[in-house]
Amino acid sequence: MASPREENVYMAKLAEQAERYEEMVEFMEKVVAAADGAEELTVEERNLLSVAYKNVIGARRASWRIISSIEQKEESRGNEDHVASIKEYRSKIESELTSICNGILKLLDSKLIGSAATGDSKVFYLKMKGDYHRYLAEFKTGAERKEAAENTLSAYKAAQDIANAELAPTHPIRLGLALNFSVFYYEILNSPDRACNLAKQAFDEAIAELDTLGEESYKDSTLIMQLLRDNLTLWTSDMQDDGTDEIKEAAPKPDNNE
């Protein structure tokens, strides 16, 4: 008979198939709670947790961007009544975003990062910590934005130190970290030069070792390398003109063999 932990993993997969991501998060939080003390999640479990939260946060991030865009248009037209309604609606989405980010950050700080024993799991969770502080920095303002940006930077830097020491330049988690760290420099810190340098260095280092890639991670690694190159192309053209194309981030997949 399946243990409660195995049952929750199965239910999380079921919820994913049904695209019921809030429930997928709940099942994976139970899996984390069931892991004894310093016991690590399996690679499959941590990927499921990541997919669950990424989908739950992703829907709200998309909503926030749409609402913010409409708000700007209405402001430029001088529709003050509409703007007031939009601001109220945007703040509702922002409170949901804050709650989701705080939920996963609490799990990471209280359990997941501390129980990580291998280089790849440490980088995975520290990258995740950076990602969710970055999502807070996307919509927070003033001192809260500054704090979120500082927390993002320290988490990504800690992850980068371990990744550079323990993971190959072609490792999908190391590449995904470089991708998201460079997006942070570009979008949050408004540092296109640093963003491009980081992305280019990660891409070049991976290219140099491409022939050492095992078959199982070849697809994952080359996909992220393509995203790094896409962003580099976009950012270098943006520095010449003010483009607004979509910036690519690392997306977790349940079948990652990291």
UniProtKB/Swiss-Prot annotation:
Q: Name one Pfam family in it.
A: 14-3-3
Start and end residues of each stretch annotated as Disordered: 238-258
PROSITE patterns attached to this UniProt entry: 1433_1, 1433_2
InterPro entries linked: 14-3-3 (IPR000308), 14-3-3_CS (IPR023409), 14-3-3_dom_sf (IPR036815), 14-3-3_domain (IPR023410)
Q: Known SUPFAM superfamilies for this protein? A: 14-3-3 protein
**Could you mention a single GO BP entry for this protein?**
protein localization
For this record, an example GO cellular component is:
cytoplasm
Compositional bias, Basic and acidic residues, is annotated for 245-258
Which family does the record claim for this protein?
A: Belongs to the 14-3-3 family.
Q: What is this protein called?
A: 14-3-3-like protein 16R
Species of the source: Solanum tuberosum
